Design a protein with these regions (language model features):
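Short cysteine-rich clusters marking metal-coordination/redox-active sites
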Residues: 1-2, 10, 28-31
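TPR-repeat structural position
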Residues: 76, 112, 144, 178-181
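Hydrophobic face of amphipathic alpha-helices that form TPR/SEL1-like repeat modules
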Residues: 58-68, 72, 97-104, 108, ...
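Cys/His-coordinated zinc-finger cores
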Residues: 4-24
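Terminal, low-structured helical/coil segments at or just beyond the last alpha-helical repeat
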Residues: 169-208
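Start-of-helix register in tetratricopeptide repeats
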Residues: 56, 93, 129, 161-163
Length: 208
């Protein structure tokens, strides 16, 4: 996440930038702002963008507090507060992270119902991991048909765990048809192929 302009770089782009000797002149490859030189500067840039209503920056601040990174103390309560704000601003990832906190009891009392509610919101906003989690909730509740539907969506978006869910929890247990699995396999491959690039392949090969 580029705290200067709010742009998010994939690992392939990051590798491409550093493969050419790093950002030209120490500048952001997108907005040309000078690169940060300290944790304090990174945090301050994020805070400034968050104060201006930037959902991405607000989400990133929450991540920093949840992990105790960039000189900030680990504080799940503060992280959730920021993610709630980011969710109001439209961040699906913030919704999903709050759901994870409720599921794991991090910073809040464990509550599967609330965890599911936040995963549902995140899934409706397009977060594939949250969609996969809904499949797990349904499978645990014995609603295998619904679980498979969620995992089919996740597999179609290229999410490996969802494809494994269709295979391991459904097809191999006789709870899904061969056609279901083959359809999931095809859609997963199509999505994965669309996301491929020479830069991402090089990044993976370098174990970046």
């Amino acid at each position: 996440y580029q705290s200067c302009c709010g742009t998010t770089l994939c690992f392939g782009c990051i590798c491409a930038v550093y493969d050419t000797g790093g950002p030209s002149g120490g500048l952001c490859p997108f907005c040309r702002t000078p690169a940060i030189t300290s944790h304090e500067e990174f945090v301050e840039r994020n805070k400034k963008r968050a104060e201006g209503g930037d959902a991405g920056a607000t989400f990133q601040l929450g991540r920093l507090y949840s992990r105790g990174r960039r000189g900030l103390p680990q504080d799940y309560g503060k992280a959730i507060e920021l993610w709630l704000r980011a969710g109001e601003l439209g961040s699906a990832s913030a919704n999903q992270n709050i759901g994870a906190c409720y599921y794991n009891g991090q910073g809040v009392e464990r509550d599967d119902r609330k965890a599911r509610c936040y995963d549902e919101l995140a899934a409706m906003r397009g977060t594939v991991k949250a969609r996969h989690n809904l499949g797990l909730f349904e499978y645990t509740a014995g609603n295998t048909e619904r679980a498979v539907k969620h995992w089919m969506v996740g597999a179609g978006a290229g999410f490996d765990n969802s494809l494994d869910g269709v295979r391991r929890h459904s097809f191999e247990e006789g709870l899904a048809t061969k056609d279901d699995f083959e359809k999931a396999l095809r859609s997963h491959k199509e999505a994965s192929d669309e996301m491929k690039s020479d830069q991402r392949d090089a990044c993976a090969a370098a174990n970046f």
